[in-house]
A protein has these predicted regions:
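Function-determining sites in protein domains
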Residues: 1-102
Length: 102
């Protein structure tokens, strides 16, 4: 549980057509409770702090997005880097939700 500390979520999305880079930093304590709790729940549901730091890149393909997402929760800090085709199902809802703020 995050208690009163909240989480800090930093997402960088790069690549895609044109190779654009966009990023967002969310401090969940600054969000209304109705947004904060579901977002923090997505971090927990993804098992984020147990995910590997990097996922294998696909052998073929171009114009995919690459995501680097870092979550800080108190003393814990973890970063995951993954390209769009390698995005695990458990992480998709978190990436989708945070990407809405890009």
């Amino acid at each position: 549980m995050t208690g009163d500390r909240g989480m800090i979520i930093h997402l960088v999305r790069s690549g895609g057509f044109g190779g654009m880079r966009r990023e967002v930093r969310i401090e969940t304590l600054s969000l209304p409770r109705g947004e904060r709790e579901p977002l923090e729940g997505l971090v927990r549901a993804a098992g984020f702090f147990s995910l590997p730091e990097k996922f294998p890149k696909p052998g073929k393909g171009a114009d995919f997005f690459t995501y680097s997402i870092t979550v800080e929760d108190g003393e814990r800090r973890h970063t995951v880097e993954v390209s769009q085709p390698s995005l695990p199902d458990g992480l998709r809802p978190l990436i989708r939700e945070v990407s809405k703020r890009l």
